[in-house]
């Protein structure tokens, strides 16, 4: 069972066993060993009016998406003061007394609120993070009873932040459509009525960061994710199935754009779905804000363009709801098998210990 908060655990010298990952899942690269392999792309209004500049932006995005499924954007039009306010309020929320946070506990199937780890039900290992999440689009999905009422100003700022991020997402979908050689409205139309979920991640200092992860390796299910991260570092990406990892260089005020599974399928596999994780450290807490832009549940998932000589990556069209269900079912089954394997390993260790004991000690 997940602890109420990680505040108390952060001060301990050793990590609780529920957070300890198998050796093959542990971090291979330090949180601050930064790489500049992920391109940073400027989206100024002036540059987006120039055909030659747009062509160059599309070229960089194609290269980044074919390679990593990740790029960063600056000069994106989201006001720096709004970003600062959102970040400040998020840090203040996680600094509140635990009893304030758990008023919005989202366990038990509640939509939105506060939770520790947020690992899949049945998983053997927890993530070292606390989150607060809320659903913001379509507007009918907003349940303000699940939006924290502290610190003061939280709701008004998060509403404005959600609105601006939706605008940025629409702009990026147009650019991605052009990068795929499609009409600029192609991806937006494929989403039907875009969903938006905002997840604020807080990663406290960790006593043994080399043994755990802030967020396990995964791909996002949706179209794109816009991630705002502080300057501490911890977002990592792989392009070779987890053999090697890089730590993404934080850029002040930038948004990291991760392509999700939906975007991957719409491109017929040409663009990667970003394979990523978050690591933690013992020196600094870390904050990131992930805005997930997903298609409507009834949206069709199928390649928008199949180039000559290619085969479709999907056997046939499915809804996003069905795609998501299959992904969750697969993740739950993998978690179940991993948990069983771990339990069997512990049983084998205990059995070996027992078999090595003299008979008089066993019967004592």
Curated annotation (Swiss-Prot):
Keywords: Dioxygenase, Flavonoid biosynthesis, Iron, Metal-binding, Oxidoreductase, Vitamin C. GO terms for biological process: flavonoid biosynthetic process. The keyword Ligase does not apply. It catalyses: a (2S)-flavan-4-one + 2-oxoglutarate + O2 = a (2R,3R)-dihydroflavonol + succinate + CO2. Binds 1 Fe(2+) ion per subunit. Pfam families: 2OG-FeII_Oxy, DIOX_N. Fe cation binds at residues 218, 220, 276. Pathway: Secondary metabolite biosynthesis; flavonoid biosynthesis. Residues 191-295 form the Fe2OG dioxygenase domain. Its EC number is 1.14.11.9. GO terms for molecular function: flavanone 3-dioxygenase activity; L-ascorbic acid binding; metal ion binding. Belongs to the iron/ascorbate-dependent oxidoreductase family. It is an enzyme of class 1 (oxidoreductase). This is Naringenin,2-oxoglutarate 3-dioxygenase. It comes from the Eukaryota. The lineage of its organism: Eukaryota, Viridiplantae, Streptophyta, Embryophyta, Tracheophyta. The gene is F3H. InterPro entries: DIOX_N, IPNS-like_FE2OG_OXY, IPNS-like_sf, Oxoglu/Fe-dep_dioxygenase_dom, Plant_2OG-oxidoreductases. Catalyzes the 3-beta-hydroxylation of 2S-flavanones to 2R,3R-dihydroflavonols which are intermediates in the biosynthesis of flavonols, anthocyanidins, catechins and proanthocyanidins in plants. PROSITE patterns: FE2OG_OXY (PS51471). Its cofactor is Fe(2+); L-ascorbate.
């Amino acid at each position: 069972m997940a602890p109420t908060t990680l505040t108390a655990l952060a001060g301990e010298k050793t990590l609780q066993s529920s957070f300890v990952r198998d050796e093959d899942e542990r971090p291979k690269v330090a949180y601050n060993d930064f790489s500049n392999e992920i391109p940073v792309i400027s989206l100024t209004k002036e540059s987006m009016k120039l055909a030659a500049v747009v062509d160059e932006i599309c070229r960089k995005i194609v290269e980044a998406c074919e390679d990593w499924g990740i790029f960063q954007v600056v000069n994106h039009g989201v006001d720096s003061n709004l970003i600062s306010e959102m970040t400040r309020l998020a840090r203040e929320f996680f600094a509140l007394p635990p009893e304030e946070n758990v008023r919005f506990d989202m366990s038990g199937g509640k939509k939105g609120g506060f939770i520790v780890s947020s690992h899949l039900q049945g998983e053997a290992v927890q993530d070292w993070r606390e989150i607060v999440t809320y659903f913001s689009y379509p507007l009918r999905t907003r349940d303000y009873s699940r939006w924290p009422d502290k610190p003061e100003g939280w709701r008004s700022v998060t509403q404005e932040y959600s609105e601006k991020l939706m605008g940025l997402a629409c702009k990026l979908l147009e650019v991605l459509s052009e990068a795929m050689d499609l009409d600029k409205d192609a991806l937006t139309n494929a989403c039907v009525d875009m969903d938006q979920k905002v997840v604020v991640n807080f990663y406290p200092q960790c006593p043994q960061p080399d043994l755990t992860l802030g967020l396990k390796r995964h791909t996002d299910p949706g179209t794109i994710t816009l991630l705002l991260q502080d300057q501490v570092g911890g977002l990592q990406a792989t392009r070779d199935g987890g053999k090697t990892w890089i730590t993404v260089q934080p850029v002040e005020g930038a948004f990291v754009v991760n392509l999700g599974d939906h975007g991957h399928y719409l491109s017929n596999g040409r663009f990667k779905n970003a394979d990523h994780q978050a690591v933690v450290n013992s020196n600094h807490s870390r904050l990131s804000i992930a805005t997930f832009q997903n298609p409507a549940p009834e949206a069709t998932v199928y390649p928008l363009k199949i180039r000559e000589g290619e085969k479709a990556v999907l056997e046939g069209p499915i809804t996003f709801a069905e795609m998501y269900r299959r992904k969750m079912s697969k993740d739950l089954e993998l978690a179940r098998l991993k948990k069983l394997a771990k339990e069997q390993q512990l049983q084998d260790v205990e059995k070996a210990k027992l078999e090595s004991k003299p008979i008089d000690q066993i019967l004592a």
